[in-house]
């Protein structure tokens, strides 16, 4: 809970940014996983939890379909990027082997 009626709480709420999906300025940044914050580690199996997208839809948020399509596009781009990265790593390994032979 956040004390939104105090100046400090109001200031912290002003700093808060919440996104469903990954918006354009952040989609090109490298993402990292914090193992201690994973749902599997943090939540007990018997506890109920709620997803932000589902809650927003229940209060008549109308952009869930847009977010879903953008997320699919992002996943496709990430898949292509990962494939190119694998190809580059394979070529680099081959080049290192060729250098060691000579």
Curated annotation (Swiss-Prot):
InterPro entries: Ribosomal_uL13, Ribosomal_uL13_sf
Transmembrane segments: none
GO biological process: translation
Keywords from the UniProt entry: Ribonucleoprotein, Ribosomal protein
Molecular function as annotated in GO: structural constituent of ribosome
Gene3D superfamilies for the chain: 6.10.250.3250, Ribosomal protein L13
Keyword match Ribosomal protein: yes
Domain of life, per lineage: Eukaryota
SUPFAM superfamilies in alphabetical order: Ribosomal protein L13
GO cellular component: nucleus; ribonucleoprotein complex; ribosome
PANTHER family, per the entry: LARGE RIBOSOMAL SUBUNIT PROTEIN UL13, RIBOSOMAL PROTEIN L13
Family, per entry: Belongs to the universal ribosomal protein uL13 family.
Descriptive protein name: Putative ribosomal protein uL13-like
Native species: Homo sapiens (Human)
């Amino acid at each position: 809970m956040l004390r939104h009626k105090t100046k400090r709480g109001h200031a912290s709420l002003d700093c808060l940014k919440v996104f469903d999906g990954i918006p354009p300025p952040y989609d090109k940044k490298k993402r990292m996983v914090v193992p201690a914050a994973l749902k599997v580690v943090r939540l007990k199996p018997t506890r109920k939890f709620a997803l932000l997208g589902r809650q927003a839809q229940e209060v008549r948020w109308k952009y869930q379909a847009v977010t879903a399509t953008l997320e699919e596009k992002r996943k496709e781009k990430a898949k292509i990027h990962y494939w190119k990265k694998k190809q580059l790593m394979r070529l680099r390994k081959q080049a290192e082997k060729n250098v060691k032979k000579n």
